[in-house]
Amino acid sequence: MIELFDVDYNLLPDNRSKELFSLRKKTFKDRLDWLVNCENNMEFDEYDNRHATYIFGTYQNHVICSLRFIETKYPNMISDGVFDTYFNDIKLPDGNYVEASRLFIDKARIQALQLHQAPISAMLFLSMINYARNCGYEGIYAIISHPMRIIFQRSGWHISVVKTGCSEKNKNIYLIYMPIDDANRNRLLARINQHATKMG
């Protein structure tokens, strides 16, 4: 059974943090070749701190997907200008929002655990909406790649592109807003239930 849960940075066990940061290195450095900082075969940065909360998706106690949330009132990758060279002036609005970053689904583990038929992206996206709603946020902002945008669109989550930029690889990247309303939540639930019916 796939389980999804959130953990604050301060409560993250050592073994789980090592697993997370190792998987992030595999995804963002080894597979995607992003400009990220790596040390001891792990990827982490200054935003992995007490203001961060992580969503984990696990199967048989193995992490298969994850992302990091940071309230936009605290330093985060978008507001701090990490992506300024890729965009022409981006700024998050004032309000009670949360930024999502370092989102990944581990393809190798999905294959090894024979989960390729499971609606993992929809489950992860639903957990994002549920977390944001439970915490009283107005919505979620993130910067994503073009392939990730396609995954969002296929899931049924009606995200909106706030601004388009160009990465160091000359690929389109997007500042997106993710609404957390009932309609989007229900579409994701329907997609998950549709898969469950097929599997059943």
From Swiss-Prot:
Coiled-coil blocks: none
Catalytic activity: a fatty acyl-[ACP] + S-adenosyl-L-methionine = an N-acyl-L-homoserine lactone + S-methyl-5'-thioadenosine + holo-[ACP] + H(+)
GO molecular function, one term: N-acyl homoserine lactone synthase activity
The protein's Enzyme Commission number: 2.3.1.184
Residue ranges of the TM segments: none
InterPro entries attached to this UniProt entry: Acyl_CoA_acyltransferase, Autoind_synth_CS, Autoind_synthase
Keyword field contains Nucleus: no
UniProt keyword annotation of Transferase present: yes
Gene3D superfamilies according to UniProt: 3.40.630.30
GO biological process, alphabetically ordered: quorum sensing; signal transduction
Keywords, ordered alphabetically: Autoinducer synthesis, Quorum sensing, S-adenosyl-L-methionine, Transferase
Top class in the EC scheme: transferase
Family listed: Belongs to the autoinducer synthase family.
Function comment: Required for the synthesis of BHL (N-butanoyl-L-homoserine lactone).
Designated name of the protein: Acyl-homoserine-lactone synthase
Native organism: Serratia liquefaciens
Taxonomic placement: Bacteria, Pseudomonadati, Pseudomonadota, Gammaproteobacteria, Enterobacterales
